UniProtKB/Swiss-Prot annotation:
Broad class of the protein's primary localization: membrane
Membrane topology value: Single-pass membrane protein
Biological role stated in the UniProt entry: Part of the twin-arginine translocation (Tat) system that transports large folded proteins containing a characteristic twin-arginine motif in their signal peptide across membranes. TatA could form the protein-conducting channel of the Tat system.
GO cellular component, one term: TAT protein transport complex
Keyword Nucleus belongs to the record: no
Pfam families attached to this UniProt entry: TatA_B_E
UniProt-recorded name of the protein: Sec-independent protein translocase protein TatA
Keyword annotations: Cell inner membrane, Cell membrane, Membrane, Protein transport, Translocation, Transmembrane, Transmembrane helix, Transport
Amino acid sequence: MGMSVSHLLIVLLIIFVLFGAGKLPQVMSDLAKGLKAFKDGMKDDGSDNDKNK
């Protein structure tokens, strides 16, 4: 039950309406930084588990 293209477009439209065109680049930048930090955290957690074994 993944997101189809139409669902993705609706979500993007809602985000655009809520934040407006001026603030949207900042919101996307913050989201990208958050995702990168999450991925880096997941990598760190995986390597810690290997050391404990």
